[in-house]
Amino acid sequence: GYVGLSIATLLAQHNEVVAVDVVPEKVAAINNRVSPIRDEYIERYFAEKNLNLRATLNAEEAYRNADYVVVAVPTNYDSHKDFFDTSLVEQVIGEIIECNPNAVIVVKSTVPVGYTESICKKFNKNSILFSPEFLRESQALYDNLYPSRIIVGHRLGEENVKESAERFA
């Protein structure tokens, strides 16, 4: 989606980035430097920049040697239950930890207040960060390149996690 692809494009300017998607056509498009979403900046960067970016359907391949893994999956909101469905976020975090327990996990998905603390406890892992996105569709890469603010949250008292958060920001 636009959150994951925009952050992948931004980071791929100076880092090796492996994007994961479940849609083969999107993976093929990214690997052929064709944006699967409408975003003028992403399209321009794909055409003009030397990005260290590839995509795969194989999540384990992407997670195995990663220092950071950004989680940008849907969290649908049910207004009748006043509830965010975070099950996909939790599934992906579990897969990352199983494959690469040392990776710093950065959640970009929309989650409820207190989620980072609860998910750290659930998985007994302190290096899970939350960094909300403030992106407009069709302007996602522009908004990542020129952010109005950068916020990264983590568990308090974890100095090494604080350093990871500062590096990510």
Question: Which residues does each PLM region occupy?
Answer:
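Structural/interface elements that position substrates and couple domains in central-metabolism enzymes
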Residues: 1-169
